[in-house]
Every structure is written in structure tokens, then in C-alpha cells.
Amino acid sequence: MKAVVAWRLRGAGLVLFCALALLAGGASAAAPNDPTVERGRYLARAGDCVSCHTGPSNVPFAGGLPMATPFGTIVSSNITPDKAAGIGDYSEAEFARALREGVRRDGKRLYPAMPYPSFAKLSDADMHALYVYFQQGVAASAAKPPPTDLPWPFSMRWLMLGWNMLYLDKGPYQPDSARSAEWNRGAYLVQGLGHCGDCHTPRSLAGGVKAASERQGDSYLAGALLDGWLAQSLRHATRPGAAQWPRDDLVAYLQTGRTAHTAAFGPMSQVVQNSTQYLSREDLGAIATYLQSVGAPAGAPAPTVNPQAAVVAAAAQSPAASKLRAGTVEGAGAMVYLNNCNACHRSSGTGADTVFPALAGNSVINAKDPTSLIRIVLAGSAMPSTEQRPAALAMPGFGWRLTDDDVAGLLSFVRTSWGNQAGPVSPAQVAKVRKALPAAAPAPSPPGRSRP
């Protein structure tokens, strides 16, 4: 997802330091149901701190997760209250400075991989609750992850002084008096702890987001490539996307990772599983209200019908559906679909509600950039496991059996069938994504021109 200088992290988005938002001290256990600790736990989940600060050992917040960036590998730190290996010696002021200004207890600068420009928007009350939680509500771990060692000149942390002058706006979130309390709550969560813009907003050559809020221009939440995935635009776009879903669909998606027509995949699946499923329905509703407004025409009413629904309803009568049902398909791509995809996603491309995502009218299918779509076909993806929907349904990868030509033909067929209106995919695009796949998600080229 990069030739430009951008801070892009693996896994739900540049959260390398949501956890320094965790610079809490002390390893003593808090009293059961302590309201401040529980509030901090809720906020830490809203910030998805655990995703980046839990490594191969699977010890929460003990760090050790290697994250690839254009500048080298960053290893997440231990943010448990262990005094030697973690953040147990941080005072509340030091914790807040790390979270808001990107400065460690020893005075060294943090890399912008940690989204401290977003966390700077936190209120003092929320900052305090986070500190108390990481001081008293997290089990200490003595694990010592290897230090981050970026090559020169990126190893010179003092360079972040200049970066901060360009991209760090100090001060908490300032409510918009012209908007409702719910809208402002949603903006606070999206711009702050949720740091949605760190994945969904394109970056400049210096690695900073081009806009940190809707007030700073149309780049905000306009979509960006991140670690081999396309974080889609969350703005009111020409092609139907999340911002044009009804409120209930947005809430359901953030709560369970699936709706009647689509499902979370890639890093977003992790965000739902570790973060948004735990948010209150009121906060999820506030997020939906805010997102529906970003990029929307002035005075536009909130969407009440998912635009994908009409496409899905008409898909069964489409020419592609008729030919697939009859087995009279034309073209290699349609044949690949019939032999590999039809059983789950059906001849109509409508899938099955909350189980197999519909391909008809799907915003991922219709995206201008097919990177995510190619990656899903090559390496597969899984839905999140949540309290409401515990089954982590998964699609297997087909990279082991389909050639680049196969995948290109398949996706070109899918992107022009059942009412979809997207451009073709080339074998070169597939080859590029296949080559960039991480070792954890291999999709080797088939040994020959295999046909399923």
C-alpha cells in the first residue's frame, strides 16, 4: 500500500503508540469494578492499544510486535506497569506528554508511527482514566522487546521536532458549536482515540496526514494504501461507501464486523475484534452520525437506505446471473468464478446475509484501486470474532492455485457483473500484490497455467 514517505503500520492502523498512551505506572491491582479503571479500560479499547502492543508471546501490552514501515522495522514497546521493562515509572504528567507530544520519559522523541497527533485531542479526564488503567488495571510483564533500530538518518529521533512543527496541533478537541452533542462526540472519537484518519487519510511526502479533520480539507478520510491494504474512503463518495450506509448498518458493522451485504476484512477485522465491538451503542451511533456528515453536501439528510441493497435486489435478474445459473458463461474470468466462487457468493453475486458478503454493489469490488480485492483472493481473509457474532468466518486464499491471469480475469468479471461498474484488473496488478504479500500470508505463484 508505497513510494511515498508515510508512517504506515501493520495491523489496524498506526497505533504503535496508543500504548504510550499507556505510560501508566505501578503494578498494584485496582479494586474490583473501580470506575476510573473501568473507564480507562473502555478508552484503551477505543484506542485499540492492544493490537500493536501485543506481540508473538500473546501477553497483552507486553509489546514485541514487529511492524514494517518504509524506514525499517519498528518493534512495539512493553506498556505494562512493570518498572524495569514497562512504563511503571511514568508519572501521569510524563504519560500525558508521551501521548500528546510524542516524548518519552527519557526525553527522546517517539516516531509518528505512534498516532500522538490524534491522541493530543484527548480530554484531561480521559487522559487520567487511561493513566490509572495502565497503572492499576493491567498485569505487569517483565518482557523486554528488542529496541527499534531504524537506519540512519531515521535513527535520529530529534528530527521529529521539525515533523511536529508541521503536523502536531497541540490542545484537546474543540467542539463545533454549530453541531449537536452527538456529532461532537463522534468527531472526538474518530479524530482522537479512534485515530481513524491515520489509516483512512492519505499522507504527504513527509509522512503526515494531509488533513486531521473535516475542517482541513477534502483529503480527510479520503482513503489510503496501508501495509498492502486499501483503507477505503469514509467520505460521502460518488460510489457508495460506508458514509452512505444507514446509521444502523454502520453501528452493526462496527459492533460485529458484518452487515447484510458486507464484512470487515484485513486490518479492519482486527479493529472490530479488539476495539469497536466493545464500544457502547451510543458511542457507535455518534461515530456513525459524524462519519455520515464528512464530505456530505450541506443540509443533506442522513442516509436511511443502503444503496447496495437496490443493486443486490436486481442482481438475480442480471445477464451474468442468468449465464452462471445456466452454465453458459463466456470468458475465462467467468469460468474461474463458476469453479471457485459461485458456491458461496452465488450466481447472483448476492452471497448470504452476514455469512458470505455480497459482491453485487460492494464498495470494495467497485473501488478504483483493486489492491484489497486482489489480496483477499490471493491470501484470503477472516471476519472478526465478536461477542455478538463469535464465529470468525474465513475465506481461504486462492493464490496457490490461480495464476495472475486467472485472478485478473476473475476480478475483471466480478467488477463488471451484477450491476458493478469498475475497471478491469491486469495480470501486472495481481503480480505486484502477490510479490508484496508478507510471509504470514503467502500466496506463491502456481507452478503452471493451472485451471480449476
Annotate each PLM feature.
Residues 1-36, 58, 74-77, 98-106, ...:
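Post-cleavage N-terminal segment of exported redox proteins
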Residues 36, 48, 91, 122-126, ...:
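An acidic site on a long C-lobe helix of protein kinase domains
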Residues 51, 58-60, 84-87, 97, ...:
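Short loop/beta submotifs within extracellular cysteine-rich repeat domains
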Residues 73-89, 94, 100-125, 145-148, ...:
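Axial heme c-ligation environment in periplasmic c-type cytochrome domains
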Residues 123, 179, 192, 227, ...:
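Active-site-proximal structural scaffolding
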